[in-house]
From Swiss-Prot:
Any one of the GO CC terms: cell division site
GO biological process, one term: division septum assembly
Record-given protein name: Myosin regulatory light chain cdc4
Chain residues that bind Ca(2+): 87, 89, 91, 93, 98
CDD domains membership: EFh
Keyword Lyase: no
Record has Nucleotide-binding as a keyword: no
Compartment(s) where it occurs, according to its Swiss-Prot or TrEMBL record: Cytoplasm
InterPro entries for this protein: CALM/Myosin/TropC-like, EF-hand-dom_pair, EF_Hand_1_Ca_BS, EF_hand_dom
Signal peptide: none
Function: Involved in cytokinesis. Required for the formation and function of the contractile ring.
Assembly: Binds to myosin II chains myo2 and myo3. Interacts with vps27 and a PI 4-kinase pik1.
């Protein structure tokens, strides 16, 4: 298969809105995610700091194939422990409001739009979410 037909080239072309063979470096995180990677915001910031304002396919492939790869999403138990801090009664449940606060205000922050999209697929019972199930669902996607 030639490079022109690769899924990476196809994804790159979708981000190359002007057909110049270059994309803005600010699109690199979204492009990496479109190619199945899961870079953290810190990784994206580090990568963007090393790139010119616009990135060509060859530069993108160097980023995509970087020697140390990208951080793995993490162990489910680590995420569960993080939510347990907010579970004062040890019920395995967290309020939707608290979940929204945690995910939009702490660590790798989600936007409100991302949070709304995420909550569409989460079973909510009496304003509460089972965070064990939530973690499994997120990591499965």
């Amino acid at each position: 298969m030639s490079t022109d037909d690769s899924p990476y080239k196809q994804a790159f072309s979708l981000f190359d809105r002007h057909g110049t063979g270059r994309i803005p470096k600010t699109s690199i995180g979204d492009l990496l995610r479109a190619c199945g990677q899961n870079p953290t915001l810190a990784e994206i910031t580090e990568i963007e700091s090393t790139l010119p304002a616009e990135v060509d396919m060859e530069q993108f492939l160097q980023v995509l194939n970087r020697p140390n790869g990208f951080d793995m999403p993490g162990d489910p138990e680590e995420f569960v422990k993080g939510f347990q801090v907010f579970d004062k009664d040890a019920t395995g449940m967290i309020g939707v409001g608290e979940l929204r606060y945690v995910l939009t205000s702490l660590g790798e922050k989600l936007s409100n739009e991302e949070m709304d999209e995420l909550l569409k697929g989460v079973p909510v019972k009496d304003g509460m979410v089972n965070y064990h199930d939530f973690v499994q669902m997120i990591l499965a996607n």
